[in-house]
């Protein structure tokens, strides 16, 4: 889970979010299952912005990008391990946040 703030204007762009999603999936070696759902939600609300949902073969990636305050909340849920530092690098490259808080949970059902 990555909570970021002080982002650039890429969080306001459908195309930028779409390209971020593609780059993230490739960089952390996941496989997309279908196309992402990217919708603009809550117009006029303090939390308005794009939300992203992408199924991956090992679970999903979800995010919400809050336009008014330049923050975003990104969840990468996968039963396949991935390099969180690579994910952080992709987020940094696309959105240039001034702050990033990371919570990484290693899953193990066995």
Where is each model-derived feature located?
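Polybasic/polar functional segments that serve as interface/processing modules
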Residues: 1-110
